[in-house]
A protein has these predicted regions:
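Pepsin/retropepsin-fold aspartyl endopeptidases
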Residues: 1-162
Length: 162
């Protein structure tokens, strides 16, 4: 199975997925930037606002998180499901969603000086906690193809206790 990310105008790989979290029961679309420098998948302020996440009541990450822009304070959203589109089959024409349950998902709440970004610039980060299940990557025709092999499928089953 392949996770397919489209490369944008500056060759950043983006994936259109779905996200669901309590108390909401419905899935919401979300754009992820493939970020190998991020150890964890993380929601950024524009998605926190768009999804209507009540971040004030969420637990705060106690350790200091340092980003390229300096230290930040993250909150934790619990019991999240991220669904990512994959393709498979000999002709790579069979489409499916791979469901990735996350017991907690860090999010960066909007600050007091928050100003929304233009929609084409809005994304959250798909980190190595998810990307590690796709060990073989190739670039082809403006896309990043990430292969999800059988060994990784078994590893995913064991780590998620499926």
């Amino acid at each position: 199975m392949l996770l397919v990310a489209k490369l944008d105008s500056i060759n950043q790989a983006r994936i259109e997925g779905l996200i669901r979290y309590a108390p909401r029961r419905d899935f919401q679309p979300i754009t992820f930037l493939v970020d190998t420098g991020s150890s964890q998948t993380c929601l950024l302020p524009d998605d926190v606002v768009r999804l209507g996440v009540d971040h004030a009541s969420l637990p705060t990450v106690t350790k200091t998180i340092v980003t390229a822009n300096g230290p930040v304070t993250l909150k934790l959203l619990r019991n999240v499901e991220v669904d990512l589109p994959v393709v498979g089959g000999i002709l790579e024409n069979k489409k499916a969603l791979i469901k990735i349950p996350l017991s907690q998902l860090p999010l960066l709440p909007p600050g007091s000086d928050y100003v929304p970004l233009p929609q084409q610039m809005v994304f959250s980060l798909l980190g190595m906690d998810v990307l590690r299940f796709f060990p073989r990557w190739t670039f082809k025709k403006g896309k990043l193809l990430m292969d999800f092999g059988e060994n990784e499928l078994e590893s995913l089953r064991q780590s998620l206790k499926i």
